[in-house]
A protein has these predicted regions:
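Sec-dependent bacterial lipoprotein signal peptides
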Residues: 1-21
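Bacterial Sec signal peptide processing site at the extreme N-terminus
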Residues: 15-38
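Short, solvent-exposed beta-strand/turn "edge" segments of beta-rich domains on protein surfaces
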Residues: 44-60, 68-76, 105-108, 152-156
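Hydrophobic core residues within well-ordered beta-strands of beta-rich domains
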Residues: 59-61, 80, 112, 161
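Short acidic, flexible loop segments centered on an aromatic residue
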Residues: 72-92
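Intrinsically disordered, low-complexity Pro/Gly/Ser/Thr-rich segments with frequent PxxP/GP/PP motifs
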Residues: 88-141
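Terminal connector regions
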Residues: 121-193
Length: 193
């Protein structure tokens, strides 16, 4: 009997120490959005310095994001979508990288990094330039000329990236608070290889 009482007392004390000190966190009043910072943009390969280029030539870019949770509870990034665009003489710019991050959790006060990578195909740019009228009145010849100029400048790290996106945050432990959607935008120049 004494042994059972001692075991019960020991278990009770251990539970009190483990759960009593931590306590339950109160429900937050509102969701602070996860902050998104572009840590860097990298070009991962070199290309020929000047035309003629091969239609299968690729440039591979990686954008390194740092996501921070300013909340004191676990935050879930339900969606993060971004587009990296480069000036091409049109208001829309040329999209060189676009991606969406799958859902991810970030610990209270924690950080994670996300580094999407995507190839940009030289041959694919011509169709994009033609449909958007980048070649101007010169049509196909103008689009080919503009594509070669664009590709040369891009490979020489002479272009500035415009990165726009949005992130949706929620609290898995407090679904009644809903979600918060936050937009972000920045400009970045690729450092030379």
């Amino acid at each position: 009997m004494e042994k059972k009482t001692l075991i019960l007392l020991t278990v009770s004390v251990c539970l009190a120490v483990l759960t009593g000190c931590a306590g339950l966190r109160p429900a937050p009043a509102k969701i602070l959005p996860v902050t998104v910072e572009v840590a860097s943009v990298e070009r991962l390969n070199a290309i020929a310095a000047k035309p003629p280029f091969n239609p299968t030539d690729v440039l591979v870019f990686r954008v390194n994001f740092k996501l921070s949770n300013p909340n004191n509870v676990l935050a879930r990034v339900d969606d993060l979508y971004f587009e990296a665009k480069v000036e091409d003489g049109t208001p829309e710019k040329t999209i060189v990288l676009a991606s969406s991050m799958p859902a991810n959790a970030i610990l209270p006060g924690g950080e994670i990094t996300w580094s999407p990578t995507e190839p940009l195909l030289y041959g694919g740019l011509l169709g994009t330039f033609l449909t958007r009228g980048v070649g101007g009145a010169d049509g196909v010849k103008g689009a080919i000329r503009k594509r070669d100029e664009f590709w040369t400048d891009l490979g020489g790290d002479k272009k500035k990236f415009s990165i726009d996106g949005n992130v949706t945050t929620s609290f898995p432990g407090f679904p009644e608070l809903g979600t918060v959607r936050n937009q972000f935008a920045t400009e970045f120049t690729v450092p030379t290889l």
